[in-house]
Regions:
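Short aromatic-glycine-(Arg/Gly/Cys) micro-motifs in beta-strand/loop hairpins
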Residues: 1-16, 25, 35
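Generic structural motif
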Residues: 10-12, 23, 42-47
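Short, mixed-charge low-complexity intrinsically disordered segments
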Residues: 32-84
Length: 84
């Protein structure tokens, strides 16, 4: 499975400020620019909700955990995250 690394700065923006194919490139860019924020590893070509289920990190227990609102807002502590 392929992954990308997404950086979201510590400011008030809701959107990421950079996307990288390699963690080393992300860390270098963050260091060079003295940034603070979170770098998270995301799988490519699979919804996060489905990824968590396929990897046994999450099992929906009822319809509320399977509806559109749950899927579009899904997040997991199992995503690899680095703080800067």
């Amino acid at each position: 499975m392929d992954y990308i690394w997404i950086f979201k700065g510590s400011g008030k923006t809701e959107f990421p400020s950079a996307v990288f194919s390699k963690k080393s490139n992300a860390i270098k860019w963050i260091a060079e620019n003295e940034l603070t924020g979170v770098l998270t590893k995301y799988p490519i070509d699979i919804p996060l909700f489905e990824w968590a289920i396929e990897n046994d990190y999450f099992t929906p227990k009822n319809e509320l955990q399977r509806n559109a609102k749950a899927i579009e807002n899904f997040n997991s502590a199992y995503f690899r995250t680095l703080s800067f």
